[in-house]
Each structure stands twice: as C-alpha cells, then as structure tokens.
Design a protein with these regions (language model features):
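Jelly-roll (double-stranded beta-helix
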Residues: 1-286
Length: 286
C-alpha cells in the first residue's frame, strides 16, 4: 500500500497537538492486498481514522468493534495503553484515506482507554463542502471532546473555487492536499503535500487551481509546547518511557489489553535503536 508520511517532518514535529499524518492510497486492494494490521499497541496518543474510500474493520482492547467508512470519524484514545487491529473489509475495492495521531498533553497522557465514533454532516458553503470531525469550522461544531483545542475537517473545493474560511487566530494550521493542486494563501500545494500556516491568522484562503474538485484535510490547534519522543506506536516524554512501553507490550502486560476477534497473532515490537531517542519539539517561535 502506498503511504506518504507528511508529519512529522524535519522542519516540524507538530501542528497543534497533531503529531503524525499518513496519507495512503488510492490503492486497488486486488493488487496490493489491502490493509491487514495485526493487534498493536499505542500509548500517550489518540488515533484519528478518516477514509476517502473503502472500509476498515476496527477492533480494540476496550472491546470496540466498528467499521470505518468514508466521512466517518473513529477516534481512539490510547492514554496509558490500548491495542487495536485494522483490516480492510471484503467489500473494499479501493482503499484511500489518512491516519492521524494526536499527542496527549502531560496532564492527560495516561487517560483511560476510550473510543468515539462520529458522523459529521456535510456543510455547504460557497465553493466548497466541509465535514468537521473535530473542533469547529464554517459554523459547524463537532461534539467529540479533545484534550487540547483542535481542528480537523475535510474540505472539498469546487473546480477553480476560492474559499476564505474564518479560523481561530490562536491556532496554527496544516493543509494536507489529497487532490489538487490547492493554494493556501501564497503557497501552492500539490497532492500529498502538507502546507503550514502559523498562528495569527483569523482567515485562511484556499484556492483550487485545478479544473476538477480538490479534496483537502485541514488540521489545526493551539501550539503544543511540550517536547515528545515518538517511536513505533508510542509517544512519551523521554527514552525511558519508550523502553517501558516496549517491555510491557513484549511481556503481554495488562497495560495494553487484548484484542478479541482478530484472526492471527499480534505484532511484535521492533528492536529499539542503539542510540537514545531525544525529545523533539517544533523550532523556537519567533
């Protein structure tokens, strides 16, 4: 399966509390085999699943069993520890979407396991259709609670449309382009590129530079001032956090629970690098 990691980047670790963005597909599952991710752990983060096409079966150690479909949010909170599996369904022919992570702040990074499913209604504005899965935009507010102020929305722009959105000036924003190209302010973004806008903007103008519709995902949030370490499926504050999480998973600790109903073994953790993984944050703010 074709996967493009757009966050973190060398120049930027986080956008708000968004710390990870994988953009995958579109893939013909008859050729690629689709998605079959065995049970694996998470800690210190929330996962956000958002599909453009296809269908994924989600199971987790909380006991959740849910289908992820286009236009539907699945938000899973790892906190101290959770495990889950992800498998594309037999009905899926084309698999296409984004997998996003949100770093939990220190005060809540050991939050209890949780799973939320939400189907946002599409909002029509001049030149675009908006689906707000987290936060608020275009007059719509997601009911899904987050641990830090966040925005997550799919925006589909009509051909050659220019749309000016009112946004929270205390947020920084990232625009992931799925189809385009799309211009955000003065920056032209091609498909699979992620653009960045700093705090201080109360509007963002998006312009579809193509003759077809353009799909984008707008992410935002207040700057996340904590430094984090991120390795495999874990987020911590220092290397020791990663070592302990890995040991707990390898030892089948109750920390991550067990996923029922998956046909197969769980994923073993890879070996840690020989070097100490140092905490990372964004460049100093000007």
């Amino acid at each position: 399966m074709k996967v493009r990691r757009t966050l973190p980047q060398r120049a930027r670790t986080l956008i708000g509390a968004w710390c990870f963005a994988d953009h995958y597909g579109p893939d013909d599952v008859a050729v690629t085999g689709g998605m079959d991710v065995a049970p694996h752990p998470h800690t210190g983060l929330q996962t956000v699943s958002w599909l453009f096409s296809g269908e994924i079966e989600h199971r987790d150690s909380l006991g959740s069993h849910e289908l992820v479909r286009p236009g539907e949010l699945n938000l899973m909170t790892g906190g101290y520890g959770i495990s889950h599996s992800e498998v594309s369904t037999a009905r899926t022919t084309i698999l296409h979407g984004v997998q996003l992570w949100v770093a939990l702040p220190e005060q809540h990074r050991y939050a209890e396991r949780d799973f939320q499913h939400h189907v946002p209604e599409p909002v029509r504005i001049a030149g675009a259709e908006v689906r707000v899965f987290l936060g608020s935009l275009a007059g719509d507010v997601s009911p899904v609670a987050t641990f830090t102020p966040l925005l997550g929305a799919e925006i589909i722009l009509e051909p050659r449309a220019a749309v000016t959105l009112t946004v929270e000036p205390g947020f920084e924003h990232g625009l992931l382009v799925d189809t385009g190209p799309v211009r955000m302010a003065d920056t032209l973004l091609r498909p699979a590129e992620l653009g960045y806008a700093d705090t201080g903007n109360d509007t963002l103008t998006l312009t579809n530079e193509s003759d077809g519709t353009a799909r984008t995902v707008l992410l935002g949030g207040t700057p996340f001032e904590e430094r984090i370490v991120m390795w495999w499926n874990f987020i911590g504050r220092n290397h020791g956090d990663l070592v302990r999480a890995r040991e707990d998973w390898q030892n089948a600790s109750d920390r991550f629970g067990a996923v029922e109903g998956y046909d197969g073994d769980r994923l073993p953790a890879p070996a840690l690098p020989n070097a100490v993984i140092a905490p990372r944050g964004n460049p100093p703010r000007r």
